[in-house]
Amino acid sequence: MSAMLMVMAGLSAKTKNAELKPRLVVLTDIGDCDVEPDDMESAVRLMSYADCIELEAIMTTVGWNCDPYPEEWTKFLDKVVDAYSIDVYNLRQRSSQKSFLSLKEENGKQRLGYWPSAEYIRNRTMAGSHRAGIGVIGEGNDSDGSDFLIRLADEDDDRPIWVAAWGGGNTLAQAIWRVKQTRTAEELKAFLRKFRIYTITDQDMVYAMRMNRAYSSHRWMLQEFKDDLKFIWDEGTWQLHVGLGVDYWQQYERQVQGHGALGRIYPKYKYGVEGDTPSFLYVMPNGLTDPEDPSQAGWGGCHVFGLCADSLTHAWTSWQEPMKSITEGYKRRFYPDELNDFCARMQWASEGRGNKNPVVVVRSKSGRMQGKVHSPSPIHIKVAAGSDVLLDASKSSDPDGDRLDFLWWQQPEASTYAHPVDISHADDSSVRISVPRDASGKTIHIVCEVHDSGPFRLVAYKRIILDVE
């Protein structure tokens, strides 16, 4: 047997045939937990989802808690990767994975369900920009991180690169500046269109300067490249996520802390919990959203394109009403399931066994269906105005044989037809939807939400978009 076949034999058939993961780069101001614990909290949680996300890089950078970034703080990121190096052998049991790919193969394209080696993640941790503000962008500010972003964009890979800014986004700003200096306008445009950035507020400055938006490189990116760089500036989801973490802290104490090596380094409560987590929950391939459409409500919030919190630039955001209340409403709805999902993964980290999420399969014979049935991406169904549409999720299953509970609901904010539609028997495995006669030319977003009956009552979703003709 060839070396490659021997390696592939260690992967389950499901993983070998799975779709590719979403690509993610994290910019973190991780540091001393006595100063700010939430980056460490979010980093632990991120590691428990390494089978769902292709971690292209984790870069240290400035944030509200520091400028410049202290070099000695990199040890806290190393601590997280060291803990992952212990727990990954239990975590990979979740995918029936017996071995790792070669490092060369890991550096290629990873599929959903694959747990990367700790060596791979260590090789992808590096320094980003360690000084804040637009004033430092330019010559002398290149870093391993900004150079690596350019390298990632140049790879032969059609998948977008999501940048989750837990601190400042200035490492991306520096990469953009460098490409602007060295490439043509069309090449710069192509570079920008490879990236999407989700920022947890604007942290390209220390906390005391947080209202001085002109200081930040974020404003430069928003003003200069608004037509080509998809930018989500979150000011509605992370604050509530922090507060809900306080409300649910006892569950963190019982079912996260102390579970596995990752749980043993999960910080003790100081103040708000995991403020940065929504940025990577946003790209979670759980069937609830297509990250390319920020109006779709998911674990990372719900956003509308409009005026930013600097009252000058425009991006996808949720800081103003009514979207602020809308995204908060969805976050309150999803949070218990989000936390249960994390806790279940920490059980795997500790014990190498536990519950797995159900698999949602939705079919319909009522219209022309587009999309992969077993993909986490939404499916589209072309339907006629005034018709009845039958959606059937009875072929959904649970890896552990658990009973499944169904709930179908409409998300009007993502739909171009914003009025309620009639969903008959919304708690059955199959439903009939009456398409209104005045919905011609519109879209209607329906979500099939499925819980199992096992520990933590894990959830999975499927979004169905009815394209009304």
Where are these regions (language model features)?
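Short, solvent-exposed loop/turn segments at the edges of extracellular beta-sandwich modules
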Residues: 451-457
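N-terminal acidic, glycine/proline-rich low-complexity segments
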Residues: 14-390, 396-418, 430, 438-441
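Short beta-strand segments within Ig-like beta-sandwich modules, predominantly Fibronectin type-III
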Residues: 422-427
